[in-house]
Design a protein with these regions (language model features):
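Structured, helix-rich domain cores that form ligand/interaction pockets
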Residues: 1-266, 274-315
Length: 315
């Protein structure tokens, strides 16, 4: 397995990973706030947002490190804030709301609830690095109906990116996705399975209000929505005993009481790749035109505001 250690504000590899529960997507809308007020609510006024084209009917968007704030749609659309998994890591690492990552989330959820805003999507994920789940077994059990769920919809997909199982339709307010994260990332020989609960609307708001550590909250919602079970003579399938692996997963998730923010997935290698591959030709031309000494002076005197994403690397 692989783990991520905070070092220079980035992610670094270690030999043994901890299983963690983390927020992995947040999307919410407001009809009463400006984009600037949303940025303030995120505690991210100090970072360099760029203005770009919006999506899904919004004309404009403010963007920084996988966080998008869309605006200028129809009058009834308001402002839409969307944070992908990496956007969630950005928020945890750079937000000035609090010093502790979990307290940052609490403060943001309090803001959302206090104004009655709508959470259009909230993903909470459990990462299994220790070998609790065999993704092939989970897939076979799903196809054989060895589970109970609030939803009748299921699908299993096997591809070059690994195996994924989804219980719950894309339209439902709650769905569970189980997939081989290592295969998705192209990390051969690594055990990394993810169990993800995706919630919408009132279900997402309800999750944000659970007064428990994130591991217990995740385990409780998962047990209520989906269980893998062993066949039994009881006519009520919900009373069938749980599969050992599902019991172990729930038990493991429950004990995760401290929210461990993995940190921004921005490291030296990505920085180097960007400079060499994206800007390399322009840099080479500048050095040839102005000379190395003058080029270095131009970089030192640049008027662009510092980007915390890069500052994290050199702390």
């Amino acid at each position: 397995g692989t783990t991520y250690k905070r070092g220079m504000g980035a992610l670094f590899m270690d030999s043994k990973a901890d299983n963690i529960v983390l927020y992995d997507w947040l999307s919410f809308t407001s009809k009463i706030h400006t984009p600037e007020q949303i940025i303030d609510a995120l505690g991210l006024f100090h970072v360099p947002w760029t203005n770009t084209k919006g999506a899904k009917g919004y004309q404009d968007r403010k963007y920084f490190s996988c966080i998008s704030i869309h605006y200028n749609g129809r009058p009834d659309m308001g402002v839409w804030c969307e944070m992908s998994g990496q956007g969630c890591r950005t928020f945890e690492t750079l937000s000035t709301l609090e010093t502790d990552a979990m307290k940052k989330w609490r403060k943001l959820f309090d803001f959302i609830r206090s104004f009655g805003l709508k959470i259009t999507r909230l993903d909470v994920a459990y990462d299994d690095h220790s070998g609790i789940l065999d993704i092939g077994e989970v897939s076979r059990d799903a196809q054989c109906g060895m589970y109970v769920s609030k939803s009748d919809y299921w699908e299993c997909i096997v591809s070059s990116k690994g195996t994924s199982i989804q219980i719950g339709s894309p339209q439902s307010k709650v769905l569970v996705r189980i997939y081989d994260k290592a295969a998705e990332r192209g990390k051969q020989g690594e055990h990394w399975n993810r169990v993800e609960i995706q919630m919408r609307d009132d279900r997402a708001i309800q999750f944000s209000m659970i007064p428990l550590p994130i591991g217990e909250a995740f385990a409780g919602v998962l047990l209520n929505y989906l269980r893998y079970v062993e066949p039994d003579t009881d006519s009520n399938k919900w009373r069938w005993p749980m599969k050992d692996y599902w019991y172990n997963l729930v038990e493991d998730a429950e004990r995760i009481s401290i929210y461990t923010a993995p940190g921004m997935e921005y490291n030296e290698e990505r920085c180097k790749r960007y400079v060499v591959n994206q800007a390399g030709n322009a840099i080479d031309a500048c050095i040839q035109m102005y000379g190395l000494y003058e080029f270095e002076r131009m970089i030192q005197d640049r008027e662009v505001a510092p980007n915390p994403k890069y500052e994290q690397l050199i702390k």
